[in-house]
């Protein structure tokens, strides 16, 4: 009877060791998985915060709301670009208006806005670029240039090349001139004077 008990005790100890070893192996297996999951969640959180920083209006801080607001904002930007391109193409294709009563070639027609009118009085049709900083990485841009084929397309290409994101934009035209006003932002540091000089040089060059 006593000998049987002494025989069973080593068996129990062996089983305990086996169970303990299996638990340790299971913990060692779970640990890398938990670390990988933690890194994945951190990366996802960082990407969501980066996405949120580009969206001007966020209705809620939940993941689903941030993604939904970003999709809505991207759709609005795409529609704005589409409408602007359509408007500009229509302006390029439209024949110039001629005032039959205006016989003096030195008399310039009235422009569409007082702002453009003041600029035209000072500079005529000469190209002019103004770039003002309105935030840490946000700027207000105004360009006056000659109205010619492909000028708006060139402007959009240059802004993409410089790394600017267009937040808001408007176009105003008069006979022979176009005013582009835009609110833009960039993720990179921007030298205002160098950027102005580069834009002015590009706007003055042939399309």
From Swiss-Prot:
<keyword id="KW-0804">Transcription</keyword>
<keyword id="KW-0539">Nucleus</keyword>
<dbReference type="GO" id="GO:0006355">
    <property type="term" value="P:regulation of DNA-templated transcription"/>
</dbReference>
<dbReference type="InterPro" id="IPR051358">
    <property type="entry name" value="TF_AMS/ICE1/BHLH6-like"/>
</dbReference>
<comment type="function">
    <text>Transcription factor. Involved in the control of tapetum development. Required for male fertility and pollen differentiation, especially during callose deposition.</text>
</comment>
<dbReference type="GO" id="GO:0046983">
    <property type="term" value="F:protein dimerization activity"/>
</dbReference>
<dbReference type="InterPro" id="IPR036638">
    <property type="entry name" value="HLH_DNA-bd_sf"/>
</dbReference>
<dbReference type="Pfam" id="PF00010">
    <property type="entry name" value="HLH"/>
</dbReference>
<protein>
    <recommendedName>
        <fullName>Transcription factor DYT1</fullName>
    </recommendedName>
</protein>
<dbReference type="GO" id="GO:0005634">
    <property type="term" value="C:nucleus"/>
</dbReference>
<dbReference type="GO" id="GO:0043565">
    <property type="term" value="F:sequence-specific DNA binding"/>
</dbReference>
<dbReference type="GO" id="GO:0048658">
    <property type="term" value="P:anther wall tapetum development"/>
</dbReference>
<feature type="domain" description="bHLH">
    <location>
        <begin position="28"/>
        <end position="77"/>
    </location>
</feature>
<comment type="subunit">
    <text>Homodimer.</text>
</comment>
<keyword id="KW-0217">Developmental protein</keyword>
<keyword id="KW-0805">Transcription regulation</keyword>
<keyword id="KW-0238">DNA-binding</keyword>
<feature type="region of interest" description="Disordered">
    <location>
        <begin position="1"/>
        <end position="38"/>
    </location>
</feature>
<dbReference type="GO" id="GO:0003700">
    <property type="term" value="F:DNA-binding transcription factor activity"/>
</dbReference>
<dbReference type="InterPro" id="IPR011598">
    <property type="entry name" value="bHLH_dom"/>
</dbReference>
């Amino acid at each position: 009877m006593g000998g049987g008990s002494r025989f069973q005790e080593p068996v129990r100890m062996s089983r305990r060791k086996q169970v303990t070893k299996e638990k340790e192996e299971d913990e060692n297996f779970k640990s890398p998985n938990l670390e990988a999951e933690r890194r994945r969640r951190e990366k996802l959180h960082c990407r969501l915060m980066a996405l949120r920083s580009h969206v001007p209006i966020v209705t809620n801080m939940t993941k689903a709301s941030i993604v939904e607001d970003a999709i809505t904002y991207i759709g609005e930007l795409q529609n704005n670009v589409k409408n602007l391109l359509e408007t500009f193409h229509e302006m390029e294709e439209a024949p110039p208006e001629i005032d039959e009563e205006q016989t003096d070639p030195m008399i310039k027609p009235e422009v569409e806005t007082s702002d453009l009118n003041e600029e035209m009085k000072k500079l005529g049709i000469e190209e002019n670029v103004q770039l003002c900083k309105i935030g840490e990485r946000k700027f207000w841009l105004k360009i006056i240039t000659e109205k010619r084929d492909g000028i708006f397309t060139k402007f959009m290409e240059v802004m993409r090349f410089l790394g600017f994101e267009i937040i808001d934009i408007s176009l105003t035209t008069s006979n022979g001139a176009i005013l582009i006003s835009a609110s833009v932002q960039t993720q990179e540091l921007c030298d205002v004077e160098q950027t102005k000089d580069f834009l002015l040089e590009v706007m003055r060059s042939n399309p």
